[in-house]
A protein has these predicted regions:
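Conserved AdoMet/S-adenosylmethionine-binding subsite of the radical SAM
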Residues: 1-125, 129-132
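C-terminal accessory extensions appended to soluble enzyme cores
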Residues: 108-182
Length: 182
């Protein structure tokens, strides 16, 4: 949040949008899946601060990894965080992950490092598939869409991308300078 003052200045003149991923409701699992980023709880604090400052936010709900973070409780927890934080939209390309050749082998190997034996389950169920959807994909997508619809959160990717491309001017134009004291 060290750039909050700059984001606020931008948002006064046009539209600043803060985007981030949320993959898991649980900080412990977050540290395993995303070891080099801040935890989910910290990201939620950022989203809430952005809401306080009236800076719109977009969450990327991806990747959803079968048998790891595809539990209904996880999805509902993330969505509740998003509702409370007042996010503008949630981008989701389906309840799964895509694995290109080369990435797949690396991913399956990495699975066994953290979740011993899980790669065998993936190989048996998905093999060389490019799209790896959760077995609960349809149910999870229904929960996702209904929660977003009821909360007034954008969830259709075309609508979100159109929103992201629209930059209305809110005040007179002026170029921000490194030397401004404002």
């Amino acid at each position: 949040m060290r750039d909050l003052d700059l984001l606020c200045q931008i948002n006064e003149r046009t539209k600043a949008v803060v985007q981030m991923t949320l993959t898991t409701y649980d900080d412990k699992l977050c540290r395993i899946l995303e070891p080099n980023v801040c935890t989910t709880s910290r990201r939620i604090q950022v989203l809430q601060k952005m809401q306080e400052e009236r800076i719109p936010t977009i969450v990327w709900l991806t990747p959803i990894l079968p048998f790891i973070n595809d539990a209904e409780e996880n999805l509902k927890g993330i969505l509740e965080y998003c509702v409370v934080a007042g996010v503008k939209g949630i981008v989701n390309f389906g309840m799964g992950v895509t694995l290109r050749e080369g990435n797949r082998e690396y991913f399956y190997h990495a699975l066994d490092q953290v979740f011993p034996g899980l790669s065998e389950k993936y190989w048996n169920k998905y093999g060389y598939d490019y799209v790896i959807n959760s077995p609960n994909s349809k149910h999870l997508l229904h929960i996702f869409r209904e929660t977003c619809r009821k909360a007034g959160i954008m969830y259709q990717t075309d609508q979100i991308f159109d929103y992201l491309k629209d930059f209305p001017e809110k005040s007179e134009y002026w170029q921000i300078s490194l030397f401004d004291n404002k």
